[in-house]
């Protein structure tokens, strides 16, 4: 009976539920969603293999080849997954990074940043709490992409004055 009471006390404690919430979040953080069009396909596959080696679980929403296709078809799937809270981070790839970035940013829970170098990725995470990184496949090397991805995944949001600013982003949708 003592063990049952101890277990009950643990389950009732606020600390247990905070731990459980953070544990579930840490598991979701290890899942990275990827999406691309044909121009970003090769870089997406390179980054996908790299992330798997780092221990991440990848959900690849397409495209599946370098045959011409429309980035919106795949960006919306990733955006929808973030909106529903099924994943917390994503990476999108197209030729310039712009089209797929604009599309995924139409989703209310997405804060996607076009990152062409590691410094931009750092600021996007620190100041904007970006949860999607858009990579311009025609303008960066594989090594640059790896550096951007590493920074994007390892930097944290600073909060403070930046939190006030990003909280104003979705106000338009609430009106």
Regions found by a protein language model. Give the residues of each.
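Helix-adjacent hinge/juxtasegments
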Residues: 74-114
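C-terminal binding/interaction regions
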Residues: 35, 39, 118-175
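A short beta-strand-loop structural module common to alpha/beta enzyme folds
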Residues: 57-68
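Glycine-rich phosphate/diphosphate-binding loop of Rossmann-like nucleotide-binding domains
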Residues: 34-52
């Amino acid at each position: 009976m003592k063990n049952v009471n101890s277990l009950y006390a643990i389950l009732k404690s606020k600390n247990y539920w905070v731990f459980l919430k953070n544990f579930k979040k840490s598991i979701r953080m290890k899942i990275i969603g990827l999406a691309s069009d044909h121009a970003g396909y090769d870089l997406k596959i390179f980054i996908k293999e790299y992330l798997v080696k780092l221990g991440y679980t990848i959900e690849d929403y397409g495209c599946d080849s370098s045959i011409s296709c429309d980035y919106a078809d795949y960006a919306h799937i990733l955006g929808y997954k973030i909106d529903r809270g099924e994943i917390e981070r994503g990476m999108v790839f197209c030729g310039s990074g712009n089209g797929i970035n604009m599309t995924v940013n139409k989703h209310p829970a997405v804060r996607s940043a076009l990152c062409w170098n590691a410094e931009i990725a750092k600021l996007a995470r620190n100041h904007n709490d970006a949860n999607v990184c858009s990579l311009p496949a025609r303008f960066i090397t594989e090594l640059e992409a790896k550096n951007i991805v590493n920074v994007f995944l390892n930097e944290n949001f600073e909060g403070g004055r930046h939190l006030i600013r990003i909280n104003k982003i979705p106000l338009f949708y609430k009106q």
